[in-house]
């Protein structure tokens, strides 16, 4: 008996969802097809009914992981402007976010990986960076445009870089200090704008 299109779509979605989590946790090369399909409860042989290649899976997984970040921001804190920015900074630069790359921001998780990806991966990453820059610009209003753009670039770079560094060091105290000092500096930045 064959599989219905609805079941195939459901399976495809499950595979991509798991891969989106794994790509944030393990990077672009950290996903094995056999293990992924097993985790999805499907056979290894069924992979090619869903994807033309492993690269196609990675492209979809990265797009999904990045898109989930957009949804999180949209459903996030309801404060506006600078207050919203401060709330986002506190959540983003938390030990909970640092400790959960699989459910965290894909821009941070893939910051040292995206350049190795194919065209779709880099385009998706670029779109997400531009989206986050625009969101930050909207939150830190009140300055002439060039300064807002510069400050949003600084803020996004600091957020992503701090999380990447905090995840990478093997000294818990240093990791927490990276997060807290960056949060303090970013809040100071918007307080003076």
Language model features: what each stretch is:
Residues 1-10, 193:
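N-terminal intrinsically disordered/low-complexity leader segments
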Residues 14, 18-25, 72-75, 158-165:
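Solvent-exposed, amphipathic alpha-helical segments
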Residues 60, 74-104, 155:
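Hydrophobic alpha-helical connector segments
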Residues 84-87, 99-126:
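Amphipathic alpha-helical segments used for helix-helix packing
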């Amino acid at each position: 008996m064959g599989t219905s299109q609805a079941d195939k779509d459901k399976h495809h979605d499950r595979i991509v969802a798991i891969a989106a989590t794994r790509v944030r946790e393990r990077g672009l090369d950290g996903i094995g097809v056999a293990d992924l399909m097993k985790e999805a409860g499907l056979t290894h042989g069924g992979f090619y009914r869903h994807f033309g290649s492993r690269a196609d899976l990675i492209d979809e997984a990265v797009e999904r992981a990045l898109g989930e970040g957009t949804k999180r921001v949209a459903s996030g804190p309801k404060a506006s402007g600078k207050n919203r920015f401060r709330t986002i900074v506190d959540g983003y630069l938390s030990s909970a976010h640092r400790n959960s790359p699989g459910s965290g921001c894909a821009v941070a998780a893939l910051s040292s990986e995206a350049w190795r990806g194919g065209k779709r991966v880099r385009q998706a990453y670029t779109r997400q960076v531009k989206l986050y820059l625009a969101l930050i610009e909207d939150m830190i209003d009140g300055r002439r445009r060039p300064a807002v753009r510069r400050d949003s670039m600084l803020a996004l770079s600091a957020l992503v870089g701090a999380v990447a560094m905090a995840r990478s060091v093997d000294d818990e105290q240093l990791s927490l200090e990276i997060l807290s000092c960056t949060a303090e500096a970013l809040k100071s930045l918007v307080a003076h704008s």
